[in-house]
């Protein structure tokens, strides 16, 4: 908490990728020798033909695209000059015309200018950090970049970089000064460094960070990466969830959806030309070898059929990873520089790496001599190549069956922070809790609606069900929560509303649209092709799913939902599907009323709400003092205010969570750190006021009925 206002300012160019389902829908082909022009040709056609609500690419479109693209290139306005923007403006109303003839002149011009300005920026930040900063001077730094104008000349640009570097260095200076002061308090004989020495060290720390940032992030960006920014800005004008996946991004997307990849099982990072190991994935080849450690540097890579090793020093990290990863069962030999400076070769056999944090996990808890189950689901994942074997619904069903075997009387499904995933997976998962019937309705432009149904008459869990959501529960999570709410099958506890993403994306392989392509992989397009609707007929677009029991959370006062996007599709509704609510032997109204009364008087939740308001007020502060005394006073005030929220993290529910029996049996022969991971999760559950209340609600529901082996839903 106390670190909130002491974070160094870091400028990063980020592309945030969200994922959904996959399919393709046409056979038209193209041919063009230039890959960039070909990509524009294919994408603009697919957008116009396949998007749910295609927009007219006219002058108004061009003007908005111009604005958004320039902002994406230089969000903090520390590269471009006012004169650059004026030069670019001659294209402001004719980018649409260029796109129609696959002309990329506008991109080429902006690309050349941004590269030039980046080289100038490297000189300016180094010049700014070469001179001592005067922290007695009374000045401020404005982080509200939307209200900052582009600089007019080099003098103003240098001043901007000076302030930015001073801002970044100020936090380092405060940390170093505090360390020296603490050392003196512990040992009266300790000789503190002078203010000049501390200030110099602080600047050196900032310089090191900036050198790493430009060398490892900015300089590694290739032309194709900048073009990806341009293409993503184009497609993003259609709606917030249509986005372009370059080949590397598509690979990352597939990994995220399946939660697995083939390789050595190590997370890598580039640090000043060297590829460094920053994490070993438990259970993976690198972890099992016992020969690799965090901070080891990979110097060379040799494939099993090659005579010589490839030197990867100085290579862009994405290129280096291509040589390190590979199919399961193949060998790779790495030349490693250990932390102590020794050089050694390590041969690994690549394997399938699974990321446990992607998958469903379950826990048992006993409350008042009654057992309940908790299932945490991070996403509605699936393996696109083997849906029946790996998908979220199959895993959740297995966890429920294990929990039932141990006699649970109620179930919590935790969908907080679950951003969605596979549409088929959520339809199958909803079917675990009803006998059969509609789950969600989807509609394409100009087509009749489709009702996606659970056709499996078996029910995996027919007992009390509570679903936890928050503002980041989106898409497939909203489909699940909405269906269970419409059926009156579950009580929804969480934020006032969920994210509000009521659209469906299909991932289109762009290579399938090109005849005789000799230009290499074109990547894919995540395209919004449908909107989905609750079985009651309403859309969750913008409005999300309204919780039955509303509780405050850390995002309560922060703009994070679909309604806060500039170009989100509108809300609408269609006719209801034919369905009947769950046989009403739960007293939902009483359970919801009791829960609301408990929540209104809950000290922990009141404190969480106050904290959320406080965090929002800090986010809204855009002016930062560069005078050290004023900065220190502000930090002291923030720390004092934050002290009253420290008890949030000390909260205890007095509940004990444990793994199901089958998982405990795995611990004995586990070669990974699964047991440790589960213990950390159980500890967090024991401090979770939302899970605590979910169990209270289950207890209320449990007392209102006798569990039936099968509960029937009539259509």
Where are these regions (language model features)?
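Bacterial N-terminal signal peptides that target proteins for export
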Residues: 3-13
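Bacterial N-terminal signal peptides
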Residues: 13-22
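Cleft-lining beta-strand/loop regions that shape enzyme active-site pockets
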Residues: 25, 31-32, 48-57, 219-224, ...
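Charged, amphipathic alpha-helical regulatory modules used
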Residues: 27-136
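PDZ/PDZ-like domain segments forming the peptide/carboxylate-binding groove
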Residues: 71-72, 93, 107, 112-123, ...
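Extended, domain-scale alpha-helical bundle/helix-rich regions
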Residues: 120-263
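Conserved functional hotspot residues or short segments at active or partner-binding sites
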Residues: 147, 151, 159, 167, ...
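Polar, glycine-rich mid-to-C-terminal structural blocks
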Residues: 476, 488, 493-560
